[in-house]
A protein has these predicted regions:
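Short, charged/polar surface micro-motifs in flexible loops or helix N-caps
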Residues: 50-52, 59-61, 80-82, 89, ...
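Short, conserved beta-strand element in jelly-roll/cupin
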Residues: 57-59, 67-84, 119
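Conserved short histidine dyad/triad with adjacent acidic residue
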Residues: 38-39, 52-68
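Short glycine-/acidic-enriched loop or helix-start segments at secondary-structure transitions
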Residues: 85-86, 94, 110, 128
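Short acidic-glycine-tyrosine-enriched beta hairpin
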Residues: 86-102
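Ligand-binding loop in jelly-roll beta-barrel domains
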Residues: 102-129
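A short, N-terminal "cap"/entry segment at the start of jelly-roll beta-barrel domains
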Residues: 1-54
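A cytosolic small-molecule/anion-sensing beta-strand core signal
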Residues: 49, 77-78, 93-94, 112
């Protein structure tokens, strides 16, 4: 399943909820990143118990949103990810991570091409509310 919405700046979000890999399958994250041509790409890589691991290759800004029932974990592999919250901005660079708690309005944005791994509950709607 793919969901392609548009950002505030006019480019499409490419959100893929299909799970690419099962247990004991090697995941070529670098290959997926290299092949990505989208400005905002979000692919579910695998399921771990009741959570999923997603790969984000992003450049630009996402819309303001929140997840009412799920926390969201972001880990920056390369680039820079800014997480805007109401009242402050968190700056994540390679090797840095954060958990955005459920119910907190936030807006991820990347001033340059950025690679992010995200962990969240399998049923989460990535676009939020």
């Amino acid at each position: 399943m793919s969901n392609s919405d548009r950002s505030a700046t006019g480019f499409s979000y490419n959100t893929r909820l299909n799970i690419l890999h099962g247990p004991l399958e090697t995941i070529d994250v670098a290959g997926l990143v290299e092949a990505c041509t989208d400005r905002w790409y979000n692919q579910t890589l695998c399921k771990v118990d009741e959570s999923v691991v997603r790969l984000g290759v992003v450049h630009g800004e996402y819309h303001w949103h929140k997840h009412d029932n799920e926390d969201e974990f972001f880990y920056v592999v390369s680039g820079q990810l800014l997480i805007d919250l109401e009242g402050r901005t968190i700056d994540l660079t390679p090797g840095k991570a954060i958990v955005v708690p459920k119910g907190v309005r936030h807006r991820p944005r990347a001033p340059e091409r950025t690679v992010v791994l995200m962990v969240e509950r399998a049923g989460i709607v990535p676009t939020g509310t």
